[in-house]
Design a protein with these regions (language model features):
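Amphipathic protein-protein interaction modules
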Residues: 332-366
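Polybasic, proline/glycine-rich intrinsically disordered low-complexity segments
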Residues: 353-397
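Charged, low-complexity, helix-prone segments enriched in Lys/Glu/Asp/Gln
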Residues: 119-123, 308, 373
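Short, well-structured alpha-helical interface segments that form or flank functional binding sites
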Residues: 98, 134, 186, 321, ...
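Charged/polar interaction segments and conserved charged motifs
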Residues: 273-290, 365-373, 394-397
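Negatively charged, low-complexity tracts enriched in Asp/Glu with abundant Ser/Thr
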Residues: 274-330
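Structured, active/binding-site neighborhoods that engage oxygen-rich ligands
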Residues: 1-275
Length: 397
């Protein structure tokens, strides 16, 4: 996420002063965060809260905009009108605002399916046009794949196949004819290409800015992917370190943010990026000990409301000895602890608006009286947004 923020900061002074070259001053005293960083951090804050509902995201986004009403470059006119109104309905935007705020989602989940699902949710609150949704999903997917060791070729092929973007161009081909374009369709592919053409983190940022146009958003999207792929410090050329007299671009990025934004970014890295889960995917032989034998179990009347369902999917909690968490794959929610799978559940949304458990399986290690409740109570929540929506029968906790 810091890569996205730094890209925004670097591109901030070139948005209305396009330079069409990679040879420029990376940072100076005028370089600052814009609406791209504010909204990126707002989404990260929402993820930290754990209650992954659209209503909570709308509340969080509007709170951030009202606290930072006049960033460099301003907000988009339709978005600003929405943010300062009592109206919460989306306005069918296809703009790149959905993609420039989604970086944190690429770091927060354990499967590509989860990542794309939540990216869609973050877009839909404002950018519910198919192109707006696609731009957010493609950006988050690229970040997820980059941080989970996919190659550039694998990322390119997946994004082209799934989202239909043409990524076979080069920055040198794009640069001479590229102009300001605020659409996802005219920003996200170019930002991904800047990453694909790069050799290290800094080069990726420079390539994105050199294209011209909406430089802060281009570099924000590129920077989010490049950080996940390269890291921000280890790939820096020596000239950057000596010229700017700092070793870590992470530190320089953080130092250009207000204290309360610094706090959210730091908490996001400590809680989500650096949580060091012991378990990543059910087919990962490096983390699963032994073959799992699934035993179908008897169902009881268990259901979750929309907010609790999404929060269950996100749950992750450190325990005194090990850790447990939830991930989604093949239509099931898998609950694990340490290196062992415990249970898996299949939910279905029914006519009453709740998600009901329609299938349930356990392993020999999954002997918990009520694992769904256990996960939600001890899971991934930040006060004062503690879990409160679990429903058993007609009783709500």
């Amino acid at each position: 996420m810091l890569g996205a923020i730094l890209g925004d900061i670097v591109g901030s002074i070139y948005e209305f002063n396009n330079i069409k070259t990679t040879h420029f001053e990376l940072l100076n005293k005028r370089s600052t965060f814009t609406d791209d960083s504010i909204l990126t951090i707002a989404v990260a804050d929402w993820l930290l809260e754990g209650a992954l509902s659209k209503e909570r995201l709308i509340f969080t986004i509007k709170r951030y905009v009202q606290k930072y009403p006049n960033p460099m470059g301003g907000y988009g006119s339709h978005f600003q009108q929405w943010a300062f109104s009592d109206e919460n309905e989306p306005y069918n935007s296809w703009g790149n605002g959905s993609a420039m705020r989604v970086a944190a989602v690429g770091w927060a989940f354990d499967t590509l399916e989860e990542t794309e699902s939540i990216a869609k949710l973050t877009a839909e609150i404002t950018h519910n046009h198919p192109e707006g949704i696609k731009g957010a999903q493609a950006t988050a997917a690229a970040i997820f794949m980059a941080r989970t060791l996919s190659t550039k070729q694998e990322i390119k092929e997946y994004i082209e196949r799934k989202y239909g973007y043409n990524l076979s161009r080069s920055c040198d081909e794009i640069r001479p004819v590229y102009h300001f374009n605020e659409s996802c369709a005219g920003t996200v592919p170019e930002a991904i290409i800047a990453f694909l053409d790069s050799s290290d983190f800094e080069t990726a940022i420079r390539l994105a800015v050199s294209l011209g146009g909406d430089t802060d958003t281009l570099a924000c999207i590129t920077g989010g992917i490049a950080e996940a792929f390269y890291g921000m410090a280890n790939s820096l050329p020596e000239t950057t370190v000596s010229e700017y007299n700092f070793k870590y671009l992470e530190e320089e990025t953080i130092n250009r943010l207000p204290e309360n934004l610094k706090k959210v970014v730091s908490e996001f890295y400590q809680t989500i990026v650096s949580k060091n889960k012991l378990f990543w995917a059910k087919n990962d032989s490096r983390t699963i000990w032994g073959e799992e034998q699934w035993i179908k179990t008897k169902l009881d009347d268990k259901k979750l409301d929309e907010e609790s369902y999404r929060s269950f999917l996100k749950s992750y909690g450190p325990d005194w000895d090990m850790r447990f968490g939830v991930y989604y794959e093949d239509g099931c929610h898998y609950v694990y602890r340490s290196n062992f799978l415990l249970k898996k559940f299949k939910f279905q949304k029914q006519d009453d608006g709740f998600y009901h458990v329609i299938e349930s399986y356990t392993t020999e290690k999954g002997d918990y009286a009520d694992l769904i409740e256990e996960v939600l109570w001890q899971g991934y929540f930040k006060p004062p947004y503690n879990y409160k929506g679990f429903v058993r029968g007609e009783r709500t906790y």
